[in-house]
Amino acid sequence: MYFLYVGIFGALGGMCRYAMNLWLGGGDFPSATLAVNLIGCFLLAFIMPFLAEKSRISLVLLNGIGTGFIGAFTTFSAFSVDTIELLQQGEVVLAISYILVSLIGGLVMVKFGRRFSNKLLRRGAHHVD
């Protein structure tokens, strides 16, 4: 059942990432990849602990959401390819900026996601069905 959930949520996550590429794609800067990775960092840090604590969702389904949807939505490989392409185009400053914004931004988004999740958990949020 785990693989089914990962597959279903993975398809949904991949489609959402594709939609973000259509919406934000184009230009010299890989803004769509940056956006999905930062959003994914926040979602993983916020949703997973919150749902694990406050919902009746099974662990298998919860892992399907995290591994499937968020795993397919985010993309380390596109980040790596985008960075190499920027370097090959001679955009060294842009490539370094992209790396720094991705890494530092990802850590900041995880911090915000956890903080927001913890805040809701402390408030005694009701069950999510």
From Swiss-Prot:
Describe the reaction catalysed, as an equation: fluoride(in) = fluoride(out)
Pfam families under this entry? CRCB
Query: What does UniProt give as GO cellular component?
Result: plasma membrane
List where in the cell it is found. Cell membrane
Describe activation and inhibition of this protein.
Na(+) is not transported, but it plays an essential structural role and its presence is essential for fluoride channel function.
Q: Report keywords, A-Z.
A: Cell membrane, Ion channel, Ion transport, Membrane, Metal-binding, Sodium, Transmembrane, Transmembrane helix, Transport
| Topology of the protein relative to the lipid bilayer | Multi-pass membrane protein
Give the GO terms filed under biological process for this record. cellular detoxification of fluoride
**Family annotation (InterPro entries):** FluC (IPR003691)
Could you give a GO molecular-function term held by this entry?
A: metal ion binding
Where along the chain is Na(+) bound?
Answer: G71, T74
Positions of transmembrane segments: 3-23, 32-52, 59-79, 90-110
State its role: Fluoride-specific ion channel. Important for reducing fluoride concentration in the cell, thus reducing its toxicity.
| Family, per entry | Belongs to the fluoride channel Fluc/FEX (TC 1.A.43) family.
Q: Cross-referenced PANTHER family, in alphabetical order?
A: FLUORIDE EXPORT PROTEIN 1-RELATED
Q: What name goes with this protein?
A: Fluoride-specific ion channel FluC 2
The species this protein belongs to is Listeria innocua serovar 6a (strain ATCC BAA-680 / CLIP 11262)
Point out the gene that encodes the protein. Answer: fluC2
